[in-house]
């Protein structure tokens, strides 16, 4: 039986041919063709084969894939039944070379054409006469990791999924001169494509960067560009530059005869007045797309057209990116070379642009004096390029070369190291010393502290105040290799000793280490000495345990590699383990019966790898258990079968195999343990071992319920906190099998399956698992388990799995449809039926916590989700009842309270849509602005409130449903949580709920503003402004901003809290305080805007408290602060100047009218600052676009993990939105609103108490 993998069709040997004019070597008439003459042409192809010695009649029918192509990347590893008789399989790769000799020189023509994808490429046609061809074949071992052949436990090859032949995947026959490259034998077949039907390895590079003209002379210019971002499977071999007359001339190639090797070109003999340039890159298989055109360039044609700044600096060195974070880069460059015709630069101008665009943007307002600069406020995940220009008294100099495309990657999330007690009694280790340094890696060693100590290594970039942890799990070796560092940067390191979970003080900081290309610091630190040959500890059937003596090394040994060979297959050595092992023992399994093996060992330290040890004696693998044959250890007869096999080579008949070879790796057992546990022996001499992950997943589909129960329980243990196991479980098909177990009638199996799905879907990094659960209909089946089971523990695990799944935005609609009503009716709503009994046990249950977590996540999904949850009977009443009970019991810091408050806050978002489904925020704002004075004044409402108070005396008039959200007693609950809770997530959500309720222009919002004042909530909120957590301060400040719409609230805030708000503004000339975000500053400016424009007295107080100086400095602080913050500060200054009675005081302070204006800010520009604010905060789904009034950086969907519960808890939402204007309808409606409700109870009343601050 023969199956071919990656078999490529041969290109036909060139035939004889003549030109149309009858001449054998006629001249070419087509100008698009290029003629060359060669003496020899080589073509080669490679074929991979798989040969099995199993008789064809004994092979299962599904294995017969003779006429189909097998994709080696899609090889599976399921078990197959053992076949009778000896079985073997061997894989080989053959390289066929053809050498052609010509009596007359060949003629080669290059034709340019455009393929189906629109890509411009070049095709070569060769015509020769009297060809003599010699073919040679050479067998090469299959070594590519993309073409591994899998075998089952009996040594049989497992079939791979079959795909149709794709002509685009056929190997191109290479024709050219007899160069070393073309005649080189390939040792492995080409890598398999990344997907079955898409061949990404096209060899055609992407478009280069937009070209720039950096220098110009009379009739000539210098053009530079950036290399392509993707080479798509091959190096860029050159560039072609094209030019056209601006604006609509034809593009003309300027490099027909040769490719440009560098990314710069001097173009001469130009006669056009104004031109544009573009560049395309040439890869392995042709030209890629052209870049975008450059900016139009005027060509100097005389001395008068040249630039007059002759003394300007020369171009600085190409800027290098030495650090990248989520929104900025740190650049470094070298100064321009000294020139007698120009003075040195007085400073530098840094410019940047989006990669692929033409316009350069100036990044710095003031000239940079140093050779480093940080460009900030860049778009995360954007690609930019940078350049630098010097400037002196003679003008702006030539620009530097572009840095090339730089991707602005978000900073990697940092994992928090568990807090450990620090004690002076633990001796710190010695100063870490560099052993080896590379581009992005450093190897360190240090003197150990005490005998049983473990070590944590920390590092930081020079200038970074924060230390980062290199290894979160303490290591026992006194050496480490730190990887993934920023290239061309500088670092320092320190080490901490850990003894019995008690940490020492950090060691002395290492010397500063510069990351440079790899170099050894000392030749006196060699690799480990060669080990002695390994010995056999135990042989049992197809498993063998080997051991060896520890290596002798001057540096700590960092692990061992074990290699094996099987002489029945070939004499090459192959690795057993994927990762180095630390123990001096290993059990190797799945060996082939009646084969003879040898083993050898290599040791690693920080300096490198030792030479392989001498090979072990041969060991013969026999079926009998625990037999160790000394005969087979000495000189076993290998039993080669000298039977010549044949492979059918396309069009060339039968070719005998020169050597039969198979690449086969025997992994240790279990597969993922780098020091596998030995076989275990019971008293009755029964032996066993732990199953591998594949075996565990196979057991899930067993018909034996005991195996299902044990396998699902063990898989739950394996998937806990191990992301790689979670990924492999998905890849091995474990998720559909777990979901199938949800239909089991055994509660313990259902519980284990739910727990596994909970672990697999924990964490943002496992979103692929969540999607796999949804695609396998897992959400509906988990919800069905919740509906039908009576087992409380099963319900807890099912709700926990849904909580983790609901953190993914794409699953929220599915969970909303399948599970929210079940959770609400069966878990939350029955709270109201508890009656007089103590509900503490129910409220404190894990099921209640998990259920509120699911609803919390789903409530942030969409407008439809909010409406559906609000309409669930008794849901809102149950949540309010729970919060009331928690406050009475002083249990306000629990995760369940956090979930409930966040859920209520999200349901309060745009709550006016409850009574007005067609609610338009812009229209509502416009109409309310016309009646602003009427809405804010309590006097016109007095009669109406008196009537409603009479109505409230009716005991049957009970408020239910969404109207409960804006009742005064609910607002009082939020204020009580703000006073008593120490959970910052609960604080933020409580403030956000008040913010949302006060954000609209209808009567219930006005009554909420009054209720907060009546309940003495204003000083509670102002007190929280002093907290260090910025996202809490932002939510509180925004809530106060909305409450300040009420005139009396605004007066009280201006009288008692003005100094607190001004303290949040940065001092003039001081560096930025990272602890205060632009959103928080924007909210504070919104409060000041309301206070200042309504009162000259408070405006005077702002000025006397140095607020004017802070606002003036803030309005000119771009780009340190965002453009929006600067604009807000300008608007506050503008309304301050509108109080004409204060002009004299301003002028006595040395200020004039121009100091209160910035740019083009006018009254009409205050539309954004005057808007009330509402938000879902950080829980808003990332798929929803933010309103254009939002400041940058307010990300949503941030998740944090609760390791104790093993579930994913989204962080509470920050209320970060922008205020709505009163005097005009904004161009784009904001994304926030509130709810209408007929007069709530007791919110209002006039009296002195209504105006009291405390």
From Swiss-Prot:
The keyword Lipid metabolism does not apply. Epidermal cells. Residues 12-22 have a biased composition (Acidic residues). Keywords: Cell adhesion, Cell junction, Nucleus, Repeat. InterPro entries: ARM-like (IPR011989), ARM-type_fold (IPR016024), Armadillo (IPR000225), FN3_dom (IPR003961), FN3_sf (IPR036116), Ig-like_fold (IPR013783), Plakophilin/d_Catenin (IPR028435). GO terms for cellular component: adherens junction; catenin complex; cytoplasm; nucleus; plasma membrane. Residues 1-38, 84-106, 145-209, 412-433, 662-685, 920-960, 1159-1254 are annotated as: Disordered. Residues 1177-1187 have a biased composition (Basic and acidic residues). It is found in: Cell junction, Adherens junction; Nucleus. SMART domains: ARM, FN3. Residues 207-302, 315-411, 428-518, 530-624 form the Fibronectin type-III domain. GO terms for biological process: cell-cell adhesion; embryonic body morphogenesis; regulation of actin cytoskeleton organization; regulation of protein localization. CDD domains: FN3. Its main location: other. Residues 145-157, 1166-1176 have a biased composition (Polar residues). Disruption phenotype: Embryos are viable, but display a partial loss of junctional component, pac-1, from adherens junctions. It comes from the Eukaryota. One of its GO terms (molecular function) is cadherin binding. Associated with the catenin-cadherin complex consisting of hmr-1, hmp-1 and hmp-2. Interacts with hmr-1. Interacts with picc-1. May act as a positive modulator of hmr-1 function during epidermal morphogenesis. Required for proper localization of other junctional components, such as pac-1. Belongs to the beta-catenin family. This is Juxtamembrane domain-associated catenin. It comes from Caenorhabditis elegans.
